Amino acid sequence: GNILGRLNPETGEMKEYTLPSGTYAHSVSLDKNQTPWFLGNKNGTVGYLDLKTEKFKVYKMPDKNARDPHTGVFDDAGIFWFTLQHSNMIGRLNPKSGDIKLATLPTKGSRPYGIKLDSSGTPWVSCNGSNCLVKVDKNTMELSEIKLPGAKTHTRRLAITPDDMVFYVNSGMGKLGRYNPKNGKITLWDNPSGENS
């Protein structure tokens, strides 16, 4: 559907808000004020719901090729970082100015999917279409690609520990991986259910 839902966990009451036409949000992220931001996966937008006025504010991508915002995360400065999977891009939105910057991944078809921040606020991105992780320079948006072992490797989601170890699920090979940015070492563990898990 094309709906944003708000659940009151104390009462169980659910309130639904119809999103702008064609949005079809893939995910929702909360900023430091608990304002819900959505990523318009079908219409190239990012936006939020003002909980006081119950009205939407929508930002259109500045590039027509940036068509599918996917997953997002806020840094401590309030900057919203997000992936655009099939557009093969990473985005950066400054909510104060509305300025959006985009960067294209170096490998065609990488399909950036999940995004997390390390302890310094540096964004890390998983590649669902290629065997890579991508580190984003938070100041310049320069992208550094880390090649992961295995041509069948595809990663959707990441988790980063307090000491900045980057864990990822290798859904293409049924493994759990860990990348150590300090020494470049990659460690892999088999999932209990095997390579098709």
Model feature map: region roles:
Residues G1-I3, Y24-S29, F38-Y48:
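A generic tandem-repeat structural signature
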Residues G1, P36-K42, F80-H86, P123-G129, ...:
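Conserved beta-strand positions in repeat-built beta-propeller and related beta-rich domains
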Residues E13-T18, K55-M61, D99-L105, E142-L148, ...:
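A short beta-strand motif characteristic of beta-propeller blades
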Residues N2-R6, T45-Y48, M89-R92, C132-K135, ...:
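A short loop-to-beta-strand structural motif that recurs across blades of beta-propeller domains
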Residues G1-K15, K52, E195-S197:
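Short intrinsically disordered, low-complexity coil segments enriched in acidic
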Residues G172-S197:
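Ankyrin-repeat and related helical/solenoid repeat scaffolds used for protein-protein interactions
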Residues N8-G12, D50-E54, N94-G98, D137-M141, ...:
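Short loop/turn segments that connect beta-strands within beta-propeller blades
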Residues S21-Q34, K64-A77, T107-S126, G150-M165, ...:
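Beta-rich, blade/repeat-based domains predominating
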